[in-house]
Swiss-Prot record:
It is a lipid-anchor. A lipid is attached at residues 205, 207 (S-geranylgeranyl cysteine). Belongs to the small GTPase superfamily. Rab family. One of its GO terms (biological process) is vesicle-mediated transport. It comes from the Eukaryota. The gene is RABH1D. Protein transport. Regulator of membrane traffic from the Golgi apparatus towards the endoplasmic reticulum (ER). GO terms for molecular function: GTP binding; GTPase activity. GO terms for cellular component: Golgi membrane; mitochondrion; vacuole. This is Ras-related protein RABH1d. The keyword tRNA-binding does not apply. CDD domains: Rab6.
């Protein structure tokens, strides 16, 4: 009887300013749904998802960080042992794009070059409100030597391709760049002891 290979686990930490859609990207990937009611992440939220690949299974541990300044002191400890840093900005909020430089630099200060960084321009559904072009996002990705992709959590655009791109870049995963959408299965939800959802705030958020 063949031995069972241990489940490879990879920690993904989501970073970026408040309201750029980090939680919405994770929710769309995990459950294929979008919540129009904005809820600010308080502290750190943790979810996990298993990806079944051709000859092995990996567990992605998704750490959703709060974008508010008062929680910034918590973030370095979560970056330190991460495999992937997903830096998100809102294409309709230029300041959030400019601030990605600080987030990327913070990751590199904590992890040097031993981490995969993905720059994500979210909310592409806000066509009329766009303030950051795809060319600018791609240029910044090239400038910092990181991967780049645009998404819309609201429309479900490029969410699974984002995670396939990440999976293909993981150590030993180079052969899985063509992982199929249907190979992704939801498995688990584990809130951390120091995380919770903030009070619901009125108004729709196209995150």
């Amino acid at each position: 009887m063949a031995s069972v290979s241990p489940l490879a686990k990879y920690k993904l930490v989501f970073l970026g300013d408040q309201s750029v859609g980090k939680t919405s990207i994770i929710t769309r990937f995990m459950y294929d749904k979008f919540d129009t009611t904005y809820q600010a992440t308080i502290g750190i939220d943790f979810l996990s998802k298993t990806m079944y690949l051709e000859d092995r299974t990996v567990r992605l541990q998704l750490w959703d960080t709060a974008g508010q300044e008062r929680f910034r002191s918590l973030i370095p400890s979560y970056i330190r042992d991460s495999s992937v840093a997903v830096v998100v900005y809102d294409v309709a909020n230029r300041l959030s794009f400019l601030n990605t430089s600080k987030w990327i630099e913070e990751v590199r200060n904590e992890r040097a070059g031993d981490v995969i960084i993905v720059l994500v321009g979210n909310k592409t559904d806000l066509v009329e409100k766009r303030q950051v072009s795809i060319e600018e996002g791609d240029s910044k990705g090239r400038e910092y030597g990181v991967m780049f992709i645009e998404t819309s959590a609201k429309a479900g655009f490029n969410i699974k391709p984002l995670f396939r791109k990440i999976a293909a870049a993981l150590p030993g995963m180079e052969s899985y760049s063509n992982t199929k959408n249907e190979d992704m299965v939801d498995v688990n939800l584990k809130p951390t002891s120091n995380s919770s959802q903030g009070d619901q705030q009125g108004g729709a958020c196209s995150c």
